[in-house]
Regions:
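Residues within the DNA-recognition helix of helix-turn-helix
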Residues: 60
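Amphipathic alpha-helical dimerization/coiled-coil segments
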Residues: 1-16, 36-37, 85-106
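Alpha-helical residues within the helix-turn-helix
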Residues: 48, 65-66
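N-terminal helix-turn-helix DNA-binding core of bacterial DNA-binding proteins
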Residues: 14-53, 75-87
Length: 106
């Protein structure tokens, strides 16, 4: 019986990998930084602050939202984006644990 790769790794490791993929692009890091400074933004706010097209910003927002790092709330004809602070704290905690374990393995 074949074992799927996802089954070989724990849920926390899968989430850390998903987080890593989500922040692996400089545009996504920029979006997260903008949202940290200005809590609620619509896509157009981000387009005005980044050297990217609306379609590209939308794609990056989709990736961040799929990972759970940001929340999108519908308001009239727009979506308002903000950081998901609960998920960010979880990722921070898991990342710190991972880094600590890597440093202690000499």
């Amino acid at each position: 019986m074949a074992i799927h790769k996802k089954e070989e790794f724990g849920r926390k490791k899968q989430h850390l990998a998903m987080f890593g993929r989500a922040i692996a692009h400089p545009a996504r890091i920029s979006i997260l930084k903008i949202l940290a400074k200005q809590e609620n933004c619509i896509c157009n706010d981000l387009v005005q602050r980044l050297p990217l097209s609306q379609a590209t910003v939308s794609q990056h927002l989709k990736e961040l939202k799929n990972c759970g790092l940001i929340i999108g709330t519908s308001y009239k004809t727009s979506t308002i984006y903000s950081l998901n602070k609960i998920i960010l704290k979880e990722f921070e905690s898991e990342f710190k644990k991972m880094m600590k374990s890597l440093k202690s393995k000499k």
